[in-house]
Amino acid sequence: MIKKIPYKLLAVSTLLTITTANVVSPVATFASEIEQTNNGDTALSANEAKMKETLQKAGLFAKSMNAYSYMLIKNPDVNFEGITINGYVDLPGRIVQDQKNARAHAVTWDTKVKKQLLDTLTGIVEYDTTFDNYYETMVEAINTGDGETLKEGITDLRGEIQQNQKYAQQLIEELTKLRDSIGHDVRAFGSNKELLQSILKNQGADVDADQKRLEEVLGSVNYYKQLESDGFNVMKGAILGLPIIGGIIVGVARDNLGKLEPLLAELRQTVDYKVTLNRVVGVAYSNINEIDKALDDAINALTYMSTQWHDLDSQYSGVLGHIENAAQKADQNKFKFLKPNLNAAKDSWKTLRTDAVTLKEGIKELKVETVTPQK
Protein backbone atom coordinates (compact mmCIF):
# COMPACT_ATOMS: atom_id res chain seq x y z
CA MET A 1 0.00 0.00 0.00
CA ILE A 2 1.17 3.52 -0.69
CA LYS A 3 2.36 5.63 2.20
CA LYS A 4 -0.39 8.06 3.22
CA ILE A 5 0.33 11.77 3.44
CA PRO A 6 1.37 12.76 7.02
CA TYR A 7 -0.85 15.80 7.10
CA LYS A 8 -4.44 16.67 6.53
CA LEU A 9 -5.12 18.13 3.11
CA LEU A 10 -6.97 21.39 2.93
CA ALA A 11 -10.71 21.22 2.47
CA VAL A 12 -11.83 20.26 -0.99
CA SER A 13 -12.98 23.84 -1.52
CA THR A 14 -9.35 24.93 -1.60
CA LEU A 15 -8.36 22.45 -4.27
CA LEU A 16 -9.14 24.59 -7.28
CA THR A 17 -7.52 25.40 -10.59
CA ILE A 18 -4.35 26.42 -12.31
CA THR A 19 -2.46 23.52 -13.82
CA THR A 20 -1.96 22.43 -17.39
CA ALA A 21 -0.98 19.25 -19.21
CA ASN A 22 1.23 18.18 -22.11
CA VAL A 23 4.71 18.43 -20.63
CA VAL A 24 7.73 17.78 -22.86
CA SER A 25 10.12 15.35 -21.19
CA PRO A 26 12.43 12.54 -22.37
CA VAL A 27 10.89 9.48 -24.01
CA ALA A 28 11.80 6.37 -22.04
CA THR A 29 11.96 2.88 -23.51
CA PHE A 30 10.50 -0.14 -21.82
CA ALA A 31 12.98 -2.71 -20.56
CA SER A 32 13.24 -6.03 -22.37
CA GLU A 33 9.98 -7.21 -23.97
CA ILE A 34 8.25 -3.91 -23.07
CA GLU A 35 6.95 -1.95 -26.04
CA GLN A 36 8.01 1.67 -26.46
CA THR A 37 5.53 4.10 -24.91
CA ASN A 38 4.82 7.56 -26.29
CA ASN A 39 6.04 10.07 -23.70
CA GLY A 40 2.97 12.23 -24.13
CA ASP A 41 0.90 9.34 -22.76
CA THR A 42 2.91 9.14 -19.54
CA ALA A 43 3.46 12.81 -18.62
CA LEU A 44 2.83 13.56 -14.95
CA SER A 45 3.45 17.31 -14.81
CA ALA A 46 2.19 20.56 -16.22
CA ASN A 47 3.48 22.51 -19.19
CA GLU A 48 5.73 24.73 -17.11
CA ALA A 49 6.06 27.62 -19.57
CA LYS A 50 2.31 27.81 -20.17
CA MET A 51 1.64 27.46 -16.46
CA LYS A 52 3.91 30.38 -15.60
CA GLU A 53 2.16 32.50 -18.20
CA THR A 54 -1.24 31.52 -16.81
CA LEU A 55 -0.21 32.27 -13.24
CA GLN A 56 1.08 35.64 -14.36
CA LYS A 57 -2.24 36.49 -16.02
CA ALA A 58 -4.12 35.47 -12.89
CA GLY A 59 -1.90 37.69 -10.75
CA LEU A 60 -2.25 40.72 -13.01
CA PHE A 61 -6.01 40.26 -13.18
CA ALA A 62 -6.27 40.16 -9.40
CA LYS A 63 -4.05 43.22 -9.06
CA SER A 64 -6.23 45.18 -11.49
CA MET A 65 -9.41 44.10 -9.72
CA ASN A 66 -7.96 45.18 -6.38
CA ALA A 67 -6.92 48.58 -7.71
CA TYR A 68 -10.18 49.44 -9.46
CA SER A 69 -12.25 48.17 -6.55
CA TYR A 70 -10.18 50.26 -4.16
CA MET A 71 -10.79 53.41 -6.22
CA LEU A 72 -14.51 52.65 -6.36
CA ILE A 73 -14.66 52.55 -2.58
CA LYS A 74 -12.46 55.66 -2.15
CA ASN A 75 -14.52 57.71 -4.60
CA PRO A 76 -16.99 60.00 -2.75
CA ASP A 77 -20.71 59.34 -2.69
CA VAL A 78 -22.71 60.79 -5.54
CA ASN A 79 -24.44 63.90 -4.18
CA PHE A 80 -27.16 65.84 -6.01
CA GLU A 81 -27.61 68.40 -3.23
CA GLY A 82 -28.14 71.88 -4.70
CA ILE A 83 -28.60 70.53 -8.24
CA THR A 84 -31.90 70.53 -10.10
CA ILE A 85 -32.48 67.96 -12.84
CA ASN A 86 -35.53 69.21 -14.71
CA GLY A 87 -37.41 66.68 -16.79
CA TYR A 88 -35.53 63.68 -15.43
CA VAL A 89 -36.69 63.42 -11.85
CA ASP A 90 -35.61 59.80 -11.54
CA LEU A 91 -32.07 60.31 -12.89
CA PRO A 92 -30.45 61.18 -9.52
CA GLY A 93 -31.87 58.03 -7.97
CA ARG A 94 -30.70 55.93 -10.89
CA ILE A 95 -27.13 57.25 -10.67
CA VAL A 96 -27.01 56.81 -6.89
CA GLN A 97 -28.08 53.21 -7.47
CA ASP A 98 -25.45 52.82 -10.20
CA GLN A 99 -22.74 53.71 -7.68
CA LYS A 100 -24.20 51.36 -5.08
CA ASN A 101 -24.22 48.54 -7.62
CA ALA A 102 -20.62 49.23 -8.60
CA ARG A 103 -19.49 49.14 -4.98
CA ALA A 104 -21.45 45.94 -4.39
CA HIS A 105 -19.54 44.32 -7.24
CA ALA A 106 -16.27 45.45 -5.65
CA VAL A 107 -17.32 43.81 -2.39
CA THR A 108 -18.30 40.61 -4.22
CA TRP A 109 -14.84 40.52 -5.74
CA ASP A 110 -13.10 41.09 -2.41
CA THR A 111 -15.15 38.80 -0.18
CA LYS A 112 -16.03 35.97 -2.54
CA VAL A 113 -14.38 35.79 -5.95
CA LYS A 114 -10.90 36.79 -4.78
CA LYS A 115 -10.99 34.02 -2.19
CA GLN A 116 -11.80 31.51 -4.90
CA LEU A 117 -8.92 32.80 -6.99
CA LEU A 118 -6.59 32.52 -4.01
CA ASP A 119 -7.82 28.96 -3.60
CA THR A 120 -6.76 28.20 -7.17
CA LEU A 121 -3.23 29.10 -6.14
CA THR A 122 -3.59 27.04 -2.97
CA GLY A 123 -4.60 24.15 -5.22
CA ILE A 124 -1.28 24.08 -7.04
CA VAL A 125 0.65 24.44 -3.77
CA GLU A 126 -1.24 21.53 -2.22
CA TYR A 127 -0.89 19.39 -5.33
CA ASP A 128 2.88 19.86 -5.23
CA THR A 129 2.88 18.84 -1.56
CA THR A 130 0.85 15.72 -2.33
CA PHE A 131 3.06 14.79 -5.26
CA ASP A 132 6.16 15.29 -3.13
CA ASN A 133 4.77 13.03 -0.40
CA TYR A 134 3.96 10.28 -2.88
CA TYR A 135 7.20 10.57 -4.84
CA GLU A 136 9.54 8.32 -2.82
CA THR A 137 6.94 5.58 -2.48
CA MET A 138 6.25 5.60 -6.21
CA VAL A 139 9.97 5.50 -7.03
CA GLU A 140 10.32 2.48 -4.76
CA ALA A 141 7.33 0.86 -6.45
CA ILE A 142 8.94 1.41 -9.86
CA ASN A 143 12.22 -0.12 -8.68
CA THR A 144 10.55 -3.17 -7.15
CA GLY A 145 7.96 -3.69 -9.88
CA ASP A 146 5.04 -3.04 -7.48
CA GLY A 147 2.23 -2.20 -9.90
CA GLU A 148 -0.53 -2.07 -7.30
CA THR A 149 1.22 0.63 -5.27
CA LEU A 150 1.91 2.59 -8.45
CA LYS A 151 -1.73 2.43 -9.50
CA GLU A 152 -2.89 3.53 -6.06
CA GLY A 153 -0.56 6.53 -6.10
CA ILE A 154 -1.54 7.65 -9.60
CA THR A 155 -5.23 7.11 -8.78
CA ASP A 156 -4.98 9.27 -5.64
CA LEU A 157 -3.24 12.05 -7.57
CA ARG A 158 -5.82 11.79 -10.32
CA GLY A 159 -8.58 12.27 -7.75
CA GLU A 160 -7.09 15.61 -6.73
CA ILE A 161 -6.78 16.61 -10.37
CA GLN A 162 -10.48 15.89 -10.89
CA GLN A 163 -11.40 17.98 -7.85
CA ASN A 164 -9.33 20.87 -9.17
CA GLN A 165 -11.01 20.65 -12.56
CA LYS A 166 -14.45 20.59 -10.96
CA TYR A 167 -13.84 23.64 -8.81
CA ALA A 168 -12.11 25.45 -11.64
CA GLN A 169 -15.35 25.23 -13.57
CA GLN A 170 -17.27 26.58 -10.59
CA LEU A 171 -14.91 29.56 -10.42
CA ILE A 172 -15.41 30.21 -14.13
CA GLU A 173 -19.17 30.17 -13.59
CA GLU A 174 -18.83 32.64 -10.70
CA LEU A 175 -16.68 34.99 -12.78
CA THR A 176 -19.13 34.72 -15.66
CA LYS A 177 -22.04 35.64 -13.40
CA LEU A 178 -20.09 38.62 -12.07
CA ARG A 179 -19.15 39.74 -15.58
CA ASP A 180 -22.73 39.46 -16.85
CA SER A 181 -24.08 41.38 -13.87
CA ILE A 182 -21.43 44.08 -14.16
CA GLY A 183 -21.91 44.28 -17.92
CA HIS A 184 -25.60 45.05 -17.48
CA ASP A 185 -24.86 47.68 -14.83
CA VAL A 186 -22.06 49.27 -16.86
CA ARG A 187 -24.35 49.82 -19.83
CA ALA A 188 -27.00 51.43 -17.61
CA PHE A 189 -24.40 53.51 -15.75
CA GLY A 190 -22.84 54.72 -19.01
CA SER A 191 -26.19 55.80 -20.39
CA ASN A 192 -27.07 57.67 -17.19
CA LYS A 193 -23.63 59.32 -17.08
CA GLU A 194 -23.97 60.63 -20.64
CA LEU A 195 -27.44 61.97 -19.93
CA LEU A 196 -26.23 63.73 -16.77
CA GLN A 197 -23.33 65.38 -18.63
CA SER A 198 -25.70 66.64 -21.31
CA ILE A 199 -28.04 68.12 -18.71
CA LEU A 200 -25.22 69.79 -16.79
CA LYS A 201 -23.79 71.33 -19.96
CA ASN A 202 -27.21 72.70 -20.89
CA GLN A 203 -27.35 74.30 -17.45
CA GLY A 204 -24.10 76.14 -18.18
CA ALA A 205 -21.68 73.92 -16.28
CA ASP A 206 -18.19 73.84 -17.80
CA VAL A 207 -17.94 70.07 -17.70
CA ASP A 208 -16.13 69.60 -21.02
CA ALA A 209 -12.76 71.00 -19.91
CA ASP A 210 -13.02 69.28 -16.56
CA GLN A 211 -14.00 66.01 -18.22
CA LYS A 212 -10.88 66.21 -20.37
CA ARG A 213 -8.73 66.72 -17.28
CA LEU A 214 -10.47 63.81 -15.57
CA GLU A 215 -9.80 61.52 -18.53
CA GLU A 216 -6.13 62.54 -18.58
CA VAL A 217 -5.67 61.60 -14.94
CA LEU A 218 -7.53 58.31 -15.27
CA GLY A 219 -5.55 57.58 -18.43
CA SER A 220 -2.33 58.18 -16.52
CA VAL A 221 -3.44 55.76 -13.81
CA ASN A 222 -4.08 53.09 -16.44
CA TYR A 223 -0.80 53.86 -18.21
CA TYR A 224 1.29 53.44 -15.09
CA LYS A 225 -0.64 50.33 -14.12
CA GLN A 226 0.25 48.88 -17.53
CA LEU A 227 3.87 49.96 -17.11
CA GLU A 228 3.98 48.15 -13.81
CA SER A 229 2.54 45.06 -15.49
CA ASP A 230 5.18 45.30 -18.22
CA GLY A 231 7.87 45.40 -15.56
CA PHE A 232 6.37 42.28 -14.03
CA ASN A 233 6.41 40.62 -17.46
CA VAL A 234 10.11 41.39 -17.83
CA MET A 235 10.91 40.04 -14.39
CA LYS A 236 9.16 36.79 -15.22
CA GLY A 237 11.56 36.39 -18.14
CA ALA A 238 14.37 35.65 -15.67
CA ILE A 239 17.13 35.66 -18.31
CA LEU A 240 20.23 37.75 -19.03
CA GLY A 241 19.77 40.08 -16.07
CA LEU A 242 16.31 41.17 -17.17
CA PRO A 243 14.83 40.76 -13.67
CA ILE A 244 16.88 43.79 -12.56
CA ILE A 245 15.58 45.88 -15.44
CA GLY A 246 12.06 44.71 -14.71
CA GLY A 247 12.47 45.64 -11.06
CA ILE A 248 13.46 49.17 -12.08
CA ILE A 249 10.40 49.47 -14.30
CA VAL A 250 8.12 48.33 -11.49
CA GLY A 251 9.76 50.73 -9.07
CA VAL A 252 9.26 53.67 -11.42
CA ALA A 253 5.67 52.70 -12.05
CA ARG A 254 4.86 52.53 -8.35
CA ASP A 255 6.49 55.89 -7.75
CA ASN A 256 4.41 57.48 -10.49
CA LEU A 257 1.22 55.89 -9.22
CA GLY A 258 1.99 57.46 -5.87
CA LYS A 259 2.37 60.87 -7.51
CA LEU A 260 -1.00 60.47 -9.19
CA GLU A 261 -2.86 60.09 -5.92
CA PRO A 262 -2.76 63.87 -5.18
CA LEU A 263 -4.21 64.48 -8.64
CA LEU A 264 -7.05 62.10 -7.94
CA ALA A 265 -7.57 63.80 -4.59
CA GLU A 266 -7.70 67.14 -6.38
CA LEU A 267 -10.39 65.82 -8.68
CA ARG A 268 -12.39 64.72 -5.66
CA GLN A 269 -12.43 68.23 -4.18
CA THR A 270 -15.54 70.35 -4.46
CA VAL A 271 -15.03 73.15 -6.98
CA ASP A 272 -18.49 73.62 -8.36
CA TYR A 273 -21.41 71.42 -7.41
CA LYS A 274 -22.16 70.47 -10.99
CA VAL A 275 -18.55 69.92 -12.04
CA THR A 276 -17.83 67.93 -8.87
CA LEU A 277 -20.87 65.74 -9.49
CA ASN A 278 -19.64 65.05 -13.01
CA ARG A 279 -16.21 64.10 -11.65
CA VAL A 280 -17.56 61.70 -9.04
CA VAL A 281 -19.85 59.97 -11.52
CA GLY A 282 -17.08 59.82 -14.14
CA VAL A 283 -14.54 58.21 -11.81
CA ALA A 284 -17.05 55.63 -10.57
CA TYR A 285 -18.08 54.71 -14.10
CA SER A 286 -14.49 54.48 -15.33
CA ASN A 287 -13.50 51.99 -12.64
CA ILE A 288 -16.48 49.67 -12.97
CA ASN A 289 -15.99 49.74 -16.75
CA GLU A 290 -12.33 48.69 -16.35
CA ILE A 291 -13.40 45.85 -14.06
CA ASP A 292 -15.85 44.70 -16.73
CA LYS A 293 -13.06 44.55 -19.32
CA ALA A 294 -10.64 42.76 -16.98
CA LEU A 295 -13.14 39.98 -16.32
CA ASP A 296 -13.16 38.88 -19.96
CA ASP A 297 -9.43 38.15 -19.91
CA ALA A 298 -9.73 36.34 -16.59
CA ILE A 299 -12.50 34.07 -17.84
CA ASN A 300 -10.49 33.21 -20.95
CA ALA A 301 -7.42 32.33 -18.88
CA LEU A 302 -9.36 30.25 -16.38
CA THR A 303 -11.19 28.42 -19.16
CA TYR A 304 -7.81 27.47 -20.57
CA MET A 305 -6.66 26.27 -17.16
CA SER A 306 -9.81 24.24 -16.61
CA THR A 307 -9.28 22.54 -19.95
CA GLN A 308 -5.72 21.71 -18.99
CA TRP A 309 -6.86 20.11 -15.73
CA HIS A 310 -9.19 17.98 -17.82
CA ASP A 311 -6.33 17.05 -20.16
CA LEU A 312 -4.08 16.18 -17.23
CA ASP A 313 -6.81 13.88 -15.92
CA SER A 314 -6.77 12.11 -19.30
CA GLN A 315 -2.99 11.84 -19.12
CA TYR A 316 -3.14 10.13 -15.73
CA SER A 317 -5.83 7.79 -17.01
CA GLY A 318 -3.47 6.85 -19.83
CA VAL A 319 -0.65 6.24 -17.36
CA LEU A 320 -2.88 3.82 -15.44
CA GLY A 321 -3.52 1.96 -18.69
CA HIS A 322 0.21 1.66 -19.39
CA ILE A 323 0.80 0.38 -15.86
CA GLU A 324 -1.88 -2.28 -16.39
CA ASN A 325 -0.26 -3.39 -19.65
CA ALA A 326 3.25 -3.41 -18.25
CA ALA A 327 2.13 -5.39 -15.20
CA GLN A 328 1.64 -8.42 -17.47
CA LYS A 329 5.39 -8.60 -18.11
CA ALA A 330 7.72 -10.73 -16.02
CA ASP A 331 10.59 -8.22 -15.98
CA GLN A 332 11.11 -6.39 -12.67
CA ASN A 333 12.07 -3.27 -14.64
CA LYS A 334 8.72 -3.16 -16.39
CA PHE A 335 7.76 0.21 -14.84
CA LYS A 336 11.09 1.98 -15.44
CA PHE A 337 9.52 3.98 -18.28
CA LEU A 338 7.74 6.11 -15.66
CA LYS A 339 10.83 7.24 -13.74
CA PRO A 340 12.06 10.03 -16.09
CA ASN A 341 8.62 11.63 -16.16
CA LEU A 342 8.20 11.20 -12.41
CA ASN A 343 11.48 13.03 -11.81
CA ALA A 344 10.62 15.79 -14.31
CA ALA A 345 7.20 16.23 -12.71
CA LYS A 346 8.67 16.57 -9.22
CA ASP A 347 10.91 19.44 -10.33
CA SER A 348 8.18 21.11 -12.37
CA TRP A 349 5.56 21.15 -9.61
CA LYS A 350 8.14 22.53 -7.18
CA THR A 351 8.92 25.44 -9.50
CA LEU A 352 5.25 26.22 -10.06
CA ARG A 353 4.58 26.03 -6.33
CA THR A 354 7.09 28.85 -5.78
CA ASP A 355 5.33 31.06 -8.32
CA ALA A 356 1.91 30.27 -6.86
CA VAL A 357 2.99 31.14 -3.31
CA THR A 358 4.51 34.44 -4.46
CA LEU A 359 1.34 35.45 -6.29
CA LYS A 360 -0.85 34.43 -3.37
CA GLU A 361 0.96 36.79 -1.05
CA GLY A 362 0.79 39.62 -3.57
CA ILE A 363 -2.94 39.22 -4.15
CA LYS A 364 -3.71 39.26 -0.42
CA GLU A 365 -1.95 42.60 0.14
CA LEU A 366 -4.87 44.90 -0.61
CA LYS A 367 -8.22 44.65 1.11
CA VAL A 368 -11.18 46.61 -0.19
CA GLU A 369 -12.44 48.87 2.57
CA THR A 370 -16.03 49.10 3.71
CA VAL A 371 -17.96 52.24 2.91
CA THR A 372 -20.83 53.90 4.78
CA PRO A 373 -24.01 53.11 2.85
CA GLN A 374 -25.76 56.00 1.12
CA LYS A 375 -29.12 56.97 2.50
UniProtKB/Swiss-Prot annotation:
Q: Which GO terms describe its biological process?
A: killing of cells of another organism
Where does this protein reside within or beyond the cell? Secreted; Host cell membrane
Bilayer-crossing residues are 232-252
GO molecular function, a single term: toxin activity
The question of whether Metal-binding is a record keyword is answered with no
Any signal peptide, and if so, which residues? 1-31
Q: Is the keyword Acyltransferase assigned to this protein?
A: no
Q: Which SUPFAM superfamilies match?
A: Bacterial hemolysins (SSF58100)
Q: Write down what this protein is called.
A: Hemolysin BL-binding component
Q: What does this protein do?
A: Cytotoxic protein, part of the enterotoxin complex. Responsible for binding to erythrocytes. This enterotoxin is thought to be the cause of the diarrheal form of gastroenteritis caused by food-borne strains of B.cereus.
Organism from which the protein derives: Bacillus cereus
Q: Give the superkingdom in one word.
A: Bacteria
The record's annotation in Pfam families points to: Bacillus_HBL
The gene designation is hblA
Quaternary structure, from the entry: Composed of a binding component, B, and two lytic components, L1 and L2. All three subunits act synergically to cause hemolysis.
